[in-house]
Amino acid sequence: MSAMQRLRLACSVILSVAIGSACATPADRSVSLKLAGTSWQLVAIQSMDDAQGTTRVADPARFTLRFGVDGRAGLRLDCNRGSGSYEARPAGDGSSGSLTFGAIATTRALCPPPHLDERVARDLGHVRSYLLKDGRLFLSLMADGGIYEWHRQPD
């Protein structure tokens, strides 16, 4: 094999590896894509304190969470709106992992009672993990602070 043929072979191998790597989806990106582009409605807030129990959301359509493909989250919090960044890091098959939200900016309209909007906005800053199961999204708060249950929003 001549030097020119070895050079062509080496260039072909390098080019093939580069193209293959560019087409491959890293695990972190693929899991983020499981959340990216999805929308959810809040149905319940489960407290780890038995005295508080579970708070059911009367109208789930008034509390929505949308994960954008750009790493931004959009929220409807009763009569308010919010947005902020998010970062998902998968564990295992991607149906669970760590999830954190950046600062959430919200409008400040005074919603009618019960006032869950402020609680949800505040608690999103304490989310540490997620679980996708049976068309539901569970967000766990740090220090056993509770679990938010969301159902997939109809398209």
Regions found by a protein language model. Give the residues of each.
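Lipid interaction determinants
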Residues: A3, S12, G20-D155
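Sec-dependent N-terminal signal peptides
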Residues: R8-L15
